[in-house]
Amino acid sequence: MEQLGTRNPSNGLETIGFSDLSVVRYNFEAAELYEEALRRGEAQLTAHGALCARTGQHTGRSPKDKYVVRDAATGDQIWWDNNSAISPENFERLRQDMLAHAKGMSLYVQDLVGGADQENALPTRVVTEFAWHSLFIRNLLIRPPREALASFLPKLTIIDLPSFKANPERHGCRGETIIACDLTKGLVLIGGTSYAGEMKKSVFTVLNYLLPNKAVMPMHCSANVGPAGDTAIFFGLSGTGKTTLSADPNRTLIGDDEHGWSDKGVFNFEGGCYAKAIRLSEAAEPEIFATTRRFGTVMENVVLDERRAPDFDNGSLTENTRIAYPLDFIPNASETGTAPQPRTIIMLTADAFGVLPPIAKLTPEQAMYHFLSGYTAKVAGTEKGVTEPEATFSTCFGAPFMPRHPSEYGNLLKDLIARNGVTCWLVNTGWTGGAYGTGSRMPIKVTRALLSAALDGSLNSAAFRTDANFGFAVPVSVPGVDDRILDPRSTWSDGQAYDAQARRLVDMFIANFAKFESHVDGSVRDAAPGTKLAAE
């Protein structure tokens, strides 16, 4: 076995059972990994210097193929309603089969860190079959100083072999694709998929399991901080504007996707960004667009034209086109990945029913309710002519990555909000003047104006009304914003149609929250939409 690159000589791949490998390349940097990926035909060089790869059959995550080892340590710690179990015996069989499959291969290893806060950092070794995967994860996680690699010891190891196919009968899984996490041993096995995001989200899942035991809140959110040290957290599901709205030229970006919140403040889990690229434009998102013209950026499933220039409007491979780049490719990104205690929490939703106001102030109890609900709406099946919006509830704004019961995260959040006196807002980036198909998308200028007022504190002194359906406080007037847009009912041509639509959405919230009722106290149950209305 030939071993190349900088590494801890006493901690090679043989220590975790690999044998008879061809070449192992440790901690190669971008130029070397470009050479490898191009030599092996894994990717193409774009006209502007990025590396572009295709993932084949899997162009997104495979949540139904994700498993957690159920053992004595995890048995009563995991939310099994939301996580599929694999037995220790099946996991061990899978591990042995993957090690056997790797014999004769050349592999790539990156020694990286998840978590910018040293006290809560997770040293992570990622072993990949593909060179472009090695560059991807090197971009996404935190890269330790080169001198630290000689003594690096991982607490988590990820083995990603896309050419390995799982056997449902032998491994106790659903199909050939598998993402199996042994949280007790700190080992993740990925096979049968080339989608690189599985590696990133596996680190997130492990941190989401470990950190609550240390009273640290893991969050699927973006974060930024103003010149006065006023940190803001942006929760939101895909497509609600997390990345776009946290990229503010007047504020320092901490990170765009995964963070922890401890008694010291907020810290990024990552050292890079994984941004959606579909319909990316220089005019709308200049900083993110600029990264596509940088050496070192990895593009995933982006279509290239005959000149090897990316066509970001082409979704023929998938709508989920992505770009992965180091955080320092963004001009105003934090160098430390840390920030003081948050002053503001923004919960983003894209309400396609056109019912929610563009902004509302939440009590701590309402914040926990909406955090556990994790609501947004998407337009379902438009290609078949179906234009009815579809409600999506993803608890904690990231259900697929939350191994513990949502109430654990919700209670942590409620305590941190109360302890730090954080102001919470619900921001609707969805539809106004009617539902999807009738109304129009909330103007980004309106959203940015309202966000600016929320972040600088001026919105706190506005006059508020109590929303009749949802019970939260809605500003009546905000400088620079048309008063009418603040009251969604007044933007509809038919007020009674609005009332009926609002009632439908309230009922959806209540039905979804039923599973959490026994896990929260009365004050959170009383924060449910419609409860104030019902009491009157």
Curated annotation (Swiss-Prot):
Binds 1 Mn(2+) ion per subunit. The keyword Metal-binding applies. Involved in the gluconeogenesis. Catalyzes the conversion of oxaloacetate (OAA) to phosphoenolpyruvate (PEP) through direct phosphoryl transfer between the nucleoside triphosphate and OAA. Signal peptide: none annotated. InterPro entries: PEP_carboxykinase_ATP, PEP_carboxykinase_C, PEP_carboxykinase_N, PEPCK_ATP_CS. GO terms for cellular component: cytosol. Belongs to the phosphoenolpyruvate carboxykinase (ATP) family. ATP binds at residues 201, 220, 236-244, 285, 322, 447. It holds the Pfam family PEPCK_ATP. This is Phosphoenolpyruvate carboxykinase (ATP). It comes from the Bacteria. Substrate binds at residues 61, 195, 201, 322. GO terms for molecular function: ATP binding; metal ion binding; phosphoenolpyruvate carboxykinase (ATP) activity. CDD domains: PEPCK_ATP. Pathway: Carbohydrate biosynthesis; gluconeogenesis. Its cofactor is Mn(2+). Keywords: ATP-binding, Cytoplasm, Decarboxylase, Gluconeogenesis, Lyase, Manganese, Metal-binding, Nucleotide-binding. SUPFAM superfamilies: PEP carboxykinase N-terminal domain (SSF68923), PEP carboxykinase-like (SSF53795). It catalyses: oxaloacetate + ATP = phosphoenolpyruvate + ADP + CO2. It is an enzyme of class 4 (lyase). Its EC number is 4.1.1.49. PROSITE patterns: PEPCK_ATP. It is found in: Cytoplasm. Mn(2+) binds at residues 201, 220, 257. One of its GO terms (biological process) is gluconeogenesis.
